[in-house]
Structures are given as structure tokens and as C-alpha cells.
Curated annotation (Swiss-Prot):
Source species: Aquifex aeolicus (strain VF5)
Lineage: Bacteria, Pseudomonadati, Aquificota, Aquificia, Aquificales
Chain segments annotated as coiled-coil in the UniProt record: none
InterPro entries: Ribosomal_bL36, Ribosomal_bL36_sp
GO molecular function: structural constituent of ribosome
GO biological process: translation
Family according to the record: Belongs to the bacterial ribosomal protein bL36 family.
GO cellular component: cytoplasm; ribonucleoprotein complex; ribosome
Keywords: Ribonucleoprotein, Ribosomal protein
PROSITE patterns: RIBOSOMAL_L36 (PS00828)
Name assigned to this protein: Large ribosomal subunit protein bL36
Key word Ribonucleoprotein present: yes
Length: 37
């Protein structure tokens, strides 16, 4: 899980979602997981 100021999709399977007021990217590829900090 990377914490970034700007989260972007890195591939076609990445999805941008909101959980508990945080913007996150979830993906099958573990290195693509991101969270906005």
C-alpha cells in the first residue's frame, strides 16, 4: 500500500473507490494499491 497525495489508475484493472472518506485504488496487482494521505 503506497500513500500518495495524488492517486492514479496504473492499469486497466485498477479501481478508484472511497472508504471512510479516503480515496483508494484497489487492484489485482498488489503493487498498484494506493491510498490518499
Amino acid at each position: 500500500m503506497k500513500v500518495r497525495s495524488s492517486v492514479k489508475k496504473r492499469c486497466a484493472k485498477c479501481k478508484i473507490i472511497r472508504r471512510k472518506g479516503r480515496v483508494m485504488v484497489i487492484c489485482e496487482i498488489p503493487s498498484h494499491k494506493q491510498r490518499q494521505g
